[in-house]
Regions:
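Negatively charged, low-complexity tracts enriched in Asp/Glu with abundant Ser/Thr
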Residues: 1-12
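Generic preference for hydrophobic/aromatic residues in regular secondary structure cores
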Residues: 4, 42-46, 65
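Short non-domain terminal segments
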Residues: 10-12, 33, 67, 75
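A short, structured beta-strand/loop element
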Residues: 15-50
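C-terminal structural segments of small proteins and small subunits
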Residues: 50-79
Length: 79
């Protein structure tokens, strides 16, 4: 379960046996979420228990790191 980044108590990761579309799981003490990382955007597809403020922060961090996270996904699964 490779961790891509942990910041502000939020962990961004994917599982070692993932499937497309490219996506990242997010965990925080509040709950969890899953985002698809597209070529141009980040899309929330699942959220359980995260506060709105935590969710918005996670989405912002994903937008800033989207290209790097996509590259790490591709290196892991297409590598």
């Amino acid at each position: 379960m490779p961790t891509l980044l942990t910041i502000f108590g939020i962990r961004f990761f994917f599982y070692s046996r993932e499937h497309e579309p490219i996506h990242v799981h997010v965990e925080h003490a509040d709950g969890k979420a899953k985002f698809i990382l597209g070529e141009d955007a980040v899309e929330l597809v699942e959220c359980k228990g995260l506060k709105t403020s935590t969710l918005k922060l996670a989405e912002s961090i994903l937008e800033e790191n989207r290209i790097d996270f996509i590259a790490q996904w591709k290196a892991t699964f297409n590598g």
